[in-house]
Amino acid sequence: MSFTSDVKKELTSNLATTGALLALVRMNGSVGIFNGLTLSITTENAGTAKYIYQMLRELYDVHAEIRVHQKTTLSKNRVYTVFITEGASELLDELSLADSLMLDNGVPEFVKNDEFIKKDYLRGAFLSAGSLHNPEKGEYQLSIASVYQEHAEDLQEIFRDFGLNARVIERKNRWILYLSKAEEIMDFLTLIGAMKARLKFEEAKIMREMRGLANRQSNFENANIAKSVMAAQEAINAIKFLNERKELEQLPENLKEIARVRLENPEATIKELGELLEPSLGKSGVNHRLRKLVEQANELRKIEN
């Protein structure tokens, strides 16, 4: 089951509300004429279809029929249509959609002016055409598709009322409202009553951040190891060069001692080299002496060239 499906499953376990039903009718509903006015509400999610059916019964005592058919002959996706014949006209009147469903493309004004209905409307909008990327796999993105630009921009206005900076873009003859910041997505999930999904999203976000931190730490450590290996090899090459030129014996005793210890322990760390000296020496002291050897070798190479 996808992350989007998990969210929608959680949302359909919530109480029936007029605002959620209103959004589903507004976004997925269509009217027809068959022995009177009919209303069809279409979805590809079986749980959402049952939720619509339940809300119609509980809120308006409207009896509907759920019809199932394949999306296309080649598609495995099923389409669920909640079909209403008796009471369709009265229901649209109750929802204040009798005229606006066919004439108005935006979110009804009374929804935008009611704090509680707005939240429920957002829940219905996500059930209708919402999608959420799995936070464990890729980028953070929550989106809601609208057929009409006006509706998408009205949703954007509602999002902003709740402090969510949503954007709207056109894609494949649809208007897509989306959030791409993890914190705002979590706030939206809380707003529409999907607390389990919010916690799961947050857990995935934390795990991704921890893995990212571990990878960066590993890269940093690997870079340091590579740097240390290169420095050790440079010092060993310098010592061998000085030894071949009979220059090593001319150097001060402290440099001869570190040269001997370095050659005898090519894989030792700087700290370990310091502990092998008598008396022992700190890392900065060891590095200083090794740099002196490298400088001596470089100066001799310049003279020879």
Swiss-Prot record:
HAMAP family: HTH_type_WhiA (MF_01420). Coiled coil: none annotated. The keyword DNA-binding applies. It comes from Lactococcus lactis subsp. lactis (strain IL1403) (Streptococcus lactis). PROSITE patterns: INTEIN_ENDONUCLEASE. SUPFAM superfamilies: Homing endonucleases (SSF55608). One of its GO terms (biological process) is cell division. It comes from the Bacteria. Involved in cell division and chromosome segregation. Belongs to the WhiA family. One of its GO terms (molecular function) is endonuclease activity. Residues 269-302 bind DNA. Transmembrane segments: none annotated. NCBIfam families: DNA_bind_WhiA. This is Probable cell division protein WhiA. The keyword Lipid biosynthesis does not apply. Keywords: Cell cycle, Cell division, DNA-binding.
